[in-house]
A protein has these predicted regions:
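Sequence/structural signature of beta-propeller domains
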Residues: 1-160
Length: 160
């Protein structure tokens, strides 16, 4: 799947009334080989005080023999700036997309001697540090410790 998926983000008022919609364009996937299981998408969005969003993109690739499986995660800061109407087609090249800036990227995997694969699916803000940096807390989903391989992981990232 060499496609940069386009997603529709919906904003809401304080009373949960649907407001503006914005188009978010994901990065192209890094997996290039056939897979037994595959998933990619935005698994978490966290709003920031300035109106921008932290967006967690993740790609989960499992090859037929499981060895070489990986989860590639990226956190972007994205700015909703050009709303679209709910009936607007979002696949056209001229459709405005949100600006985004890469803040962090990491990869977990299953190797011959290392099994640290983690499918991060939750994200929230942690404390703000004395220097103004922001802690982001992430949590993975082990699917009930699937195949005795996946584990529950917590990860913290400091954004300067």
């Amino acid at each position: 799947n060499p496609i940069e998926n386009r997603l529709r983000f919906q904003s809401f008022s304080d009373s949960l009334k649907a407001m503006e919609q914005y188009v978010y364009k994901m990065d192209k996937p890094i997996a290039r080989k056939p897979s037994k299981y595959y998933a990619m998408g935005v698994s978490a969005i966290t709003p920031l005080a300035d109106g921008s969003l932290l967006v967690l993109e993740r790609e989960f690739y499992v090859p037929p023999m499981f060895m070489g499986s990986f989860v590639n995660c990226k956190i972007y800061q994205a700015w909703p700036s050009m709303p679209i109407t709910h009936d607007k087609e979002i696949t056209a090249d001229e459709t405005p997309v949100m600006d985004k800036f890469l803040l962090a990227e990491w990869k977990t995997n299953i190797g011959l001697f290392k099994r640290n694969i983690a499918n991060y699916e939750g994200m929230c803000l942690g404390p703000q540090l004395a220097d103004g940096s922001q802690v982001v807390v992430l949590v993975s989903d082990s699917q009930g410790q699937y195949a005795n391989t996946l584990k529950d992981w917590f990860k913290t990232i400091v954004i300067k």
